[in-house]
């Protein structure tokens, strides 16, 4: 079979020499590791975790809304103090092995974690200010929120895409948009189209200082649109 693009390289998610195979021109979701099936943003995130936190396997880590491959699976397998959460609404505290946590109003104690990880989650949060504030609260001093979020608007101002009305119904302010959700077949509504000014939003709401990293390295299978990784540090 002839693919759109393929190359040999090293996958930081499964730690193997592999082929990276793109089945079409939208690399973000379709430039896949032949072994672990990870995609570029997952590899970019794992690369930066290992670069800046080489002792990550010894750290206390919370990941919200993990998937079952790539960086999430590696963290789960290598980190004894890794906790995964999903948000199921008002329900039991543990569901399907996941802790039930609303990122905007968490039940974790203050200063619980060295790292908080989210992958393409923040664009589905209705109140990101509360979520960033809560993430900062649960981080230890010097800890970091390492995350991916599609910076669709780039240099343009962040736009609110959807909100909740007084009855918690979703109101889209722009064209209706959903992304896949592993625990909800309806998908997750897109609530914001972020730009680079997200760093100001994070600082104003949480006091965390944020860097944006853009990696382009086909040898590591890291090439695609909107795969920036953000690291927000609690000073």
Indicate where each model-derived feature is located.
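Hydrophobic adenine-recognition pocket in adenosine-nucleotide-binding enzymes
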Residues: 117, 121, 151
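Glycine-rich nucleotide phosphate-binding loop and flanking beta-alpha elements
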Residues: 68-70, 123, 153
């Amino acid at each position: 079979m002839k693919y759109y693009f393929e190359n040999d390289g090293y996958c930081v998610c499964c730690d193997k020499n592999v082929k990276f195979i793109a089945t079409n021109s939208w690399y973000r979701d379709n430039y896949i590791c032949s072994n672990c099936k990870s995609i570029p943003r997952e590899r970019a995130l794992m690369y930066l975790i290992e670069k800046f936190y080489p002792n990550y396997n010894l750290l206390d880590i919370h990941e919200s809304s993990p998937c079952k491959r790539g960086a999430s699976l590696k963290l789960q397998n290598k980190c004894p103090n890794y906790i995964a959460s999903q948000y199921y609404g008002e329900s039991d505290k543990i569901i399907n092995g996941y802790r039930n946590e609303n990122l905007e109003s968490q039940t974790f104690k203050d200063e619980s974690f060295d790292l908080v990880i989210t992958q393409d989650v923040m664009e589905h949060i209705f109140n990101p200010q509360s979520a960033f504030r809560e993430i900062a609260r649960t981080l230890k001093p010097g800890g970091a929120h390492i995350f991916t979020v599609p910076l669709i608007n780039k240099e343009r101002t962040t736009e609110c895409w959807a909100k909740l009305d007084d009855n918690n119904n979703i109101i889209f302010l722009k064209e209706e948009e959903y992304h896949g959700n592993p625990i909800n077949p309806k998908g997750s509504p897109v609530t914001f189209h972020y730009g680079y000014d997200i760093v100001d939003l994070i600082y104003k709401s949480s006091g965390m200082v944020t860097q944006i990293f853009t990696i382009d390295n086909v040898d590591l299978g890291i090439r695609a649109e909107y795969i920036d990784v953000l690291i927000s540090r609690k000073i």
